[in-house]
């Protein structure tokens, strides 16, 4: 049984109850939305994961990517990244490791967080293929499905799988004038496999078998966007939309099978086209939860892509995205370190709050009101507590403390609030 099959059978699970309480929404509404596929609760049956609801009418959620590379293999650092992610309010984590002993790294991350954990199995599939056959693109169906099953048994809560790349998708790509080609690493493995071997994508041709496997462990399928644009110049082009059409069809098959599913979206989109992308996805995928990387509305901010991501992410979430994948200052430059993780997460959480306020979320507005009252009352401790990052403003105030205890060192005795308050007392 999965969260979706239970919901379809009018069964309210403890995970649905938890999400309902967290969102301050009637649990029967949560059940109905899970049954229809509008909300997912990624939680593998083998793991004691903190339940998180992702979908329409819920708060915008934020994911943190972490993981090793072939150039930097430090399990302890990845564990610290996972701990920082939970400490600073991430809703989920993805282990994207490609260097070192991947099963051991995954095991340690699963052990050191209660958050839902996702993976991209194609990374491990490619490495196993290289070790066995000499190239990452020479994998066979046994390697693919054995890897997916093994990760499911380990407790992975959601998996990004590039099921929508087909021979027809690649024909569309080859006939397009796209500048950057395929920038998705997992998507590139599948694309190269199809082009070299002239075979169909096994994740597409064996999709029903894949669903049986995921259903057994209640792994949420995150349909990867292997044809996502890698730069603004390629946004909303035919390869991207062709794949999205296929993903919409696969969403229907997931729902029929009782497998929870969400859909991943583009990472580079000009600001004036963000809303269009969200509406296209929500229409083609029948309101499946939408998971976006950023998106980045400019490609010229290397070293500051957490800021561009927050700008694009706020508009994306306001326009329909439900799950924001953070972007760190290290994006497009190097592997992220712990400080990058913290900064990227905070920026993405700001975007989520901005969007939730704009959408009228009652919990988001309640926090804004609390902050207004705390500022009116010069309650600095409460302001720090309510801040998305409470540590930084505390340190900043300590670095240059005000002479007037209630004020800050910008206005001091000329604080507008204090001035009017004093005048009112006379």
UniProtKB/Swiss-Prot annotation:
One GO-annotated biological process of the protein: thiamine diphosphate biosynthetic process
EC number: 4.1.99.17
Binding residue positions for [4Fe-4S] cluster: 408, 411, 415
Bound cofactor: record note: Binds 1 [4Fe-4S] cluster per subunit. The cluster is coordinated with 3 cysteines and an exchangeable S-adenosyl-L-methionine.
Catalytic activity annotation: 5-amino-1-(5-phospho-beta-D-ribosyl)imidazole + S-adenosyl-L-methionine = 4-amino-2-methyl-5-(phosphooxymethyl)pyrimidine + CO + 5'-deoxyadenosine + formate + L-methionine + 3 H(+)
InterPro entries linked to this entry: ThiC, ThiC/Bza_core_dom, ThiC/BzaA/B
Binding site for substrate: 65, 94, 123, 162, 184-186, 225-228, 264, 291
Gene3D superfamilies: 6.10.250.620, Radical SAM ThiC family, central domain
GO molecular function, one term: zinc ion binding
Keyword annotations of the record: 4Fe-4S, Iron, Iron-sulfur, Lyase, Metal-binding, S-adenosyl-L-methionine, Thiamine biosynthesis, Zinc
Similarity annotation: Belongs to the ThiC family.
Chain's role: Catalyzes the synthesis of the hydroxymethylpyrimidine phosphate (HMP-P) moiety of thiamine from aminoimidazole ribotide (AIR) in a radical S-adenosyl-L-methionine (SAM)-dependent reaction.
Name this polypeptide is given: Phosphomethylpyrimidine synthase
Origin species: Methanococcus aeolicus (strain ATCC BAA-1280 / DSM 17508 / OCM 812 / Nankai-3)
Phylogenetic classification of the source organism: Archaea, Methanobacteriati, Methanobacteriota, Methanomada group, Methanococci
